[in-house]
Structure formats: C-alpha cells, structure tokens
Amino acid sequence: MKLFGTDGIRGIVNEFLTPEIAFRLGNVLGNMVDKKIFIAKDTRASGDMLEEALVAGITSAGVDAYKCGVLTTPALALITRLENAAGVMISASHNPPEYNGLKVLMRGYKLPDDIEERIEREMEKIRYCEYKSVGKVIEYDFASEEYFEYIKKQYSFLDLSGIKLVVDVANGATYKLNPQILEYFGAKLEVVNDRPDGFNINRDCGSTHPENVKKNITGSKIAVLYDGDGDRCIFVDEKGEEFHGDKILGITAIDLKKENRLKKNNVVLTILSNMGLEEFLKNNEINVVRTKVGDRYILEEMLKNDYTLGGERSGHIIYRDKSTTGDGLITTLEVLSSLVKSGLTLHDLSNRIPDYPQVMVNVEVKNKEIYKNKKVFSLMKSIKDYRVIIRPSGTEPVIRVLVEGPDLEKITDIANKFYELIKELDKE
C-alpha cells in the first residue's frame, strides 16, 4: 500500500491513517536526523492521537520531539528553517474532519519524491535506540511568537487601519494567530468560524466554502478565507465576488515587479491557471511558466530557476522571498498591501484581470486509472477551441475534469459529457 500522496500521507483516520503509521514515520525520521524534530497540528480531534504516536516513534529512535501545539503549516516551516531542523505537520489541509495527514518538512521545505519513497521503504522496519538514549518530549511554547516576530519584521511598513475585514479561519489552525497579526497591523476585523471543536474544521466554512461568508459582506467590507492548515487563502470582494488565487497572482505580480522583487520577471502557474491570467501577465510584460497541479511542483520550478512568485487558483501562493511554502497570512498581507497602495477597491483590482469561465466536475470513481481510457482521449480530441484538463485527485477517490472557454453553457455541456463517460466506464 502506497502511503505518500501529493501532499504527504493523508487519509481517513483509523481506516487509512492509523497511529501505527504515525509511530513508524516518527521512528524512521528519528533514525534519519540527529537533533530534534518539531511537531505541529491543526484542530482536528484526531490530531492528539496521531501526535502522541508520532512522538513515541521519534523518541524511541533517540531524538527529542518538540511539540508546538496548534500551528499553521507555514509557521512550522519557518520554525524548521530557523532551527535548521525537521518537522511534521499533522493536518489534512482543506479536507473534512474525518481526514488527517502527516506532512514532513526539512529546513522549511517539503520533501522531494525520492526521499519520501526512501522513508516509505524504511517504515517497514522499526529500529529502537538503547534505553539510555531515548529522546525527550519538549513543549515548545515559542513557535507562535517566533512566527509573529518574523511577520512583523517582514511587513514593518504596513498600515491596514483603513481595512474592514471579515476573517474566516475555518475552525482550523489559523483561528488564533492570524486574527491577532491582522489586528496588530490595524485592520478592523470580524472573525467567523473561530470556535474549533475538533470536528468542525472546514465544515461549511473556510476557503472551500466562500458562499457563507458572502452573506456578511456589506458596504466596504472584504473577506479573507483560510483553509484548515493556513497555507492558502482566497478573498471575497466588496461585491461578494471571489478573488481567488489567479487574481491574487495577477495583482501582486504587478507590485512585485515594481518593487524589483519579481526575479527573472517570471510567474509560475499550473495547468489549471486561467488563460485570462496568462494574458494579463503577458500584457504587462511578465513571463509565465506552467507546472503540474500542486504547490510542491510550483516550488520545484521556482527553486530550479530561482523564481520569486508562483501559485494556483486554489489560493496556494508562494512568495519565495518571504517563505519556503504557501502561506495564507503572507498572501493576505501581500494582497492588502497592494490594495492600500492602489487606492482602489478589491473589486476594481479584480476587474483588471480577465477570467474565462471554468467548470470543474469531480467524478467519484472506484478506479482512478479510468481517465487514461481511449474513449476519454477520443472525446478530448473532438473538443476544439476549449481547454480540457482531466486528472485524478492525489488524496480522494475522484477524477477531476476542468473545462475552460468563452461560453459558459458550452463548457458546462462538455464537462457533463466527460462526467457521464467516466461514470459509465467506471461501471465496466
């Protein structure tokens, strides 16, 4: 059974992701590093169980486990970079509460595929240290403070005193720290979905459910919505319209270029990024590179070619001069900084970037390899003047079909044809 997917080990708790897996991962990591390992988690009820198993595995290999408590993925990434250490984030990001995950970080970065494959092989055996060398468990209470101080230094110029902001923290890892930091910069906040109970993370809230926050938008208010582990965000503008990752990339790329922060005058997108964004960037003399879907592939391209900015429509945006990973809070501050400098409304900024209609359908299947079927390829070849992208989910039993083009009715019809075909093939 393959454990690592597109974003670490992730699945339904006690069906796929068990305490034994957490223990084995901790034991392997403890045998790979020679100092300490930092652990953080989001607000899922299963986080405590997985944390204790992970700690047992780490300490059984003779390494100290530093428990950071509830913390965002980007904050943990910063801690591991500052401490030159490894870390494990216990979170399933935007997935519902019955899911959880284990994401390994090394000096701020996610692991490359070959290291994950090595870890997975090593997890088949357990290696204990001698009893005198068992690691210690340390409650690391300074993680939030270290992250807060870092953000304050990076954005010391920022004044958000004119901003009225609804903040949806998704009952997740951002529920305390992000509002505190935004208030520090002067924004007037209305915080929602900030009472996690272990079972309500991402439940009809956060970046995957903007429809509920739209009801709170009145007057000059705007909203920012985070996911469960805080590595991404989207906005809702004054008109109640979504300001998603493509819009974020377009607007902030212009400012990064003006500030000489946009290395090689290039932005990294994915195959799902809207053609309207690409046109906007090229019209502003900014080059574009596309990668596979997933922030890990965006980051790989950025590191390989020394680019500063990359991201995807879902709100995973990487500002590599500020962070080693997607960071919802840094994204928020970059967008609000652009908003303040422009003197415009968020809606006005949004309208600068064309957005071709897109329809995405998620097809639940038993066999995710169905998308390679010849009949699917034949239908794709028959589609002219519209963009069709079909790919399996890395974390769910789902095939995703994206259709993009100028006519909404037409792309909806195309998407439905693929849905019906894949469903029919999955029955065979």
Curated annotation (Swiss-Prot):
GO terms for cellular component: cytosol. The modification Phosphoserine is found at residue 93. Mg(2+) binds at residues 93, 227, 229, 231. InterPro entries: A-D-PHexomutase_a/b/a-I, A-D-PHexomutase_a/b/a-I/II/III, A-D-PHexomutase_a/b/a-II, A-D-PHexomutase_a/b/a-III, A-D-PHexomutase_C, A-D-PHexomutase_C_sf, A-D-PHexomutase_CS, Alpha-D-phosphohexomutase_SF. It comes from the Bacteria. It catalyses: alpha-D-glucosamine 1-phosphate = D-glucosamine 6-phosphate. Binds 1 Mg(2+) ion per subunit. Its cofactor is Mg(2+). The active site is at residue 93. Activated by phosphorylation. Its EC number is 5.4.2.10. CDD domains: GlmM (cd05802). The keyword Lipid biosynthesis does not apply. GO terms for biological process: carbohydrate metabolic process; peptidoglycan biosynthetic process; UDP-N-acetylglucosamine biosynthetic process. Belongs to the phosphohexose mutase family. This is Phosphoglucosamine mutase. It comes from Thermosipho melanesiensis (strain DSM 12029 / CIP 104789 / BI429).
